[in-house]
Amino acid sequence: MLQKPLIFVDIETTGSTIGRSRIIEIAIIRIENNSIVEEFQSLVDPETSVDSFITGLTGITNRDLKDAEIFPLVYKKCAHLFEGAIFVAHNASFDYNFIKSELTQIGYNFSIPRLCTVRLSRKLYPQYKSHSLEQIIERHGIQVNARHRAMDDIKATWDWWQIAHKEHDHSTIFSHIQSQLKKQTSLTQIESSQISKLPKTPGVYIFYNQDHVPLYVGKSINIQ
């Protein structure tokens, strides 16, 4: 079993472009000893307007955000939840890199272990083609009040996590989790000056060992 606490995180944004789009909502649940110990949810002032598509998707309007605080102030209220934890999200690179981008703009280096439940679902349920949150909710009969709202989405992800642990041997799940976390260790060996030279665009990345043998091939909406 994992020894570290888990934080399930979900954000809603003004768009999908990291560095240009902004966060409009964040929700977090912290898990310790397989139980929720704390929850956090807040709207966020994106310092820009929300278009009709995003409002239609999330139900969040510009009026809703009028009195919201900007992300650095919101983060101060929930930063303690990240301490010593593993960041868990559905399509984790999206949520993680958005938060990292927001904090980088104020000079804060955000870096914690992360775990993607999309990748974990692919490993545990290879018989299925789609592993979107929508499909997972439908497949497992998970009850959700409001899709595309941050707290409802992470509660759905947490429900799936518990279902997966009932349907699979814990050692199998732990092995897949460890594999994900292990692949991230190579990133810590890359100097920040090298990372800053990478493009902030979608693409494919490959990690090689010292003999130039490919170790891992991945893709991201933001290579940096």
Regions found by a protein language model. Name each.
Residues 8-9, 115, 215-217:
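Short hydrophobic beta-strand that contains or immediately precedes a catalytic carboxylate
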Residues 13-15, 119, 156, 222:
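Short, glycine/acidic-enriched loop or turn micro-motifs at the edges of active sites
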